[in-house]
Amino acid sequence: MIEIEIRDINNNIVGKKEVPDIVFNNSASESVVHTAVVAYMANQRQGTHCTKTRSEVSGGGKKPWRQKHTGRARHGSIRSPLWRKGGIVFGPKPRDYYIQLPKQMKDTALFKALTMKYRDNEILLLDNLSLNRIKTKDMVEILKNLQLEESSVLIALPEKDEKVLLSARNIPYIGVVRAEDLNAYHVAMFDKVVFTVAGLDKLLSIKGVS
């Protein structure tokens, strides 16, 4: 078990929490994080890109000039890839980029990414994060108290919190996710990861870690 400090929004230590080694002291290879991030990014692609080959470009059915005795190079179509506005050779066509990973590999990648953050002192555990109103200024003040104003920060909450979400929405370097939606890509994209105690408990519960 690993013991991690619990802080309040004023950056005061208010307690400690024991977390299983698998979460913040995972021994898996770092390559699993790379695999998970590549898969996540590939799965975001629409794959709707499309170019036309010489047979699909409109026009070009007529031979532009006769084969011989013109002094010019021989051509059979103005839609040859050699011509301006001609077809594309080996261009992209619509395809599915989806990469399916086993659930266990995704979980391992997430825990390994969290382990890497923890070893770099980039994990913060808060007792609670709640706002009385929707106010960006209030969220900025909390980040300053936690000395996070110069870092990109991912906040993992147990449930969707409109006040936190809307207060953080206008801050370009802040991300807010539900703990159950957290993945290795999210963790890798931000400098710091902030959990609430309830958010971390929710993550452990969903992943079956005790």
UniProtKB/Swiss-Prot annotation:
UniProt keyword terms in alphabetical order: Ribonucleoprotein, Ribosomal protein, RNA-binding, rRNA-binding
Single annotated GO MF: structural constituent of ribosome
Biased composition (Basic residues): 63-76
InterPro entries hit by this protein: Ribosomal_uL4 (IPR002136), Ribosomal_uL4-like (IPR013005), Ribosomal_uL4_dom_sf (IPR023574)
GO BP terms: translation
Transit peptide as UniProt keyword: no
Region (Disordered): 49-76
Family: Belongs to the universal ribosomal protein uL4 family.
Protein name: Large ribosomal subunit protein uL4
Lineage per the UniProt record: Bacteria, Pseudomonadati, Nitrospirota, Thermodesulfovibrionia, Thermodesulfovibrionales
